[in-house]
A protein has these predicted regions:
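Extended, low-polarity segments enriched in aliphatic/aromatic residues
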Residues: 1-156
Length: 156
């Protein structure tokens, strides 16, 4: 698991075919799903592979043609691919949108960390134990966006 499921995870893992997903999860070792669990790479290699896939998608579609929307509700420690995910422990944080996938994911990560919600503890532990922010770091290094952002609230 990537440790953090936002825009970057969804434009890499979410768009990829079964063979593409296997290629991402194994950091390029294989595209054969039957070989996936025998070829799991170090965690950071997997996260960097997600950033590589993001770069490919954005390059193909054109950054000017993309908008990223993260709906931060019912936040669970488990991936949405888990057939039996843990119940959410954290309240909703809102909807985040940007033309910058790095900024929107960094903003969501920071919103979790800075939330007063006591339910954040388990989510932060999961993100940190999986080095979830590394996909954001790698995507920024690829030039896919900026980790600095400004929150503009539409509620106020």
């Amino acid at each position: 698991m990537g440790g953090f499921g936002g825009a970057l995870k969804n434009i890499s893992i979410g768009i990829a075919s079964t063979h593409g997903n296997t290629n991402i999860h194994t950091a390029g070792v294989t595209t054969e799903a039957a070989e996936l669990f025998n070829n799991l790479p170090p965690q950071d290699h997997f996260l960097e592979s997600m950033a590589d896939a993001c770069k490919a998608v954005i390059s193909y579609k054109g950054a000017e043609n993309m908008l990223y929307i993260n709906v931060a509700n019912r936040l669970s420690v488990d991936c949405d691919c888990d057939s039996h995910p843990a119940e959410p422990e954290m309240s909703d944080l809102g909807i985040f949108a940007s033309v910058d996938p790095v900024a929107v994911d960094q903003a969501c990560y920071d919103a979790v960390v800075n939330s007063p919600d006591p339910g954040k503890k388990a989510l932060i532990e999961r993100m940190d134990s999986r080095h979830g922010i590394h996909t954001v770091e790698a995507a920024a290094q690829h030039g896919l966006g900026n980790r600095e952002y400004e929150i503009i609230s539409l509620d106020e």
